[in-house]
Amino acid sequence: IQRRAGGNLLTLASGATLVARAVVLAVGNTPRRIPAARLRGAVRLADAWDYDGVAAIPADADVCIIGSGLSMVDAVLSLDHGGHRGRIRVLSRHGLMPLAHAVSGGADNAPVDALLALGLRDRLRLVRAWTRAANAAGEPWQWVFDRLRPHGQALWRSLTHVEQQRFLRHLVRYWDIHRHRIAPQVAHTLAALRAGDRLEVLAGRLQSVEAGGDGGIT
């Protein structure tokens, strides 16, 4: 990228060039890695998106998945569909799993102006009141979050910087499991694996990963 008067000149790997008034780097999230300082010995690791690596895990091996978000769900389903019989342990700081979608509905917009005028604590109280009212009316709580979906940017930008940081420290994990949900069928599969003692979800912080003499890890 070369900055020029009135714009930017981008040279591609092919040698072709583009001229743009503004350049936005939208490269997505980089893959998260376990810090090398916490790895001891020849530890075998597989990225959740390394399908060949996941498929190569022995069917009877015990598996530990770091993180309990949507990527974890994909990894567990890949193992289960591949006939994995070993126990799967999931470790995350809070041990929270994505919640399930409800049947579609509740498309009317939320009265977002009422939220925009409030601070973070009062917003949380109002959203909780809405979910209680929805339950009392026979509606699933998921509809409340679906109504908020179109207003995510406005809600975020209307918070002060201090409140944004407070949200990231204390609430984002709970927001994520309510907002980024999974299909009911997937939730049923995970529940069945947990009931069958094949899937265990643990809350904790990873301190180290050490290769064992039997090929396992601790």
Language-model segments: residues:
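Flavin (primarily FAD) cofactor-binding/catalytic cores of flavoenzymes
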Residues: 1-117, 127-218
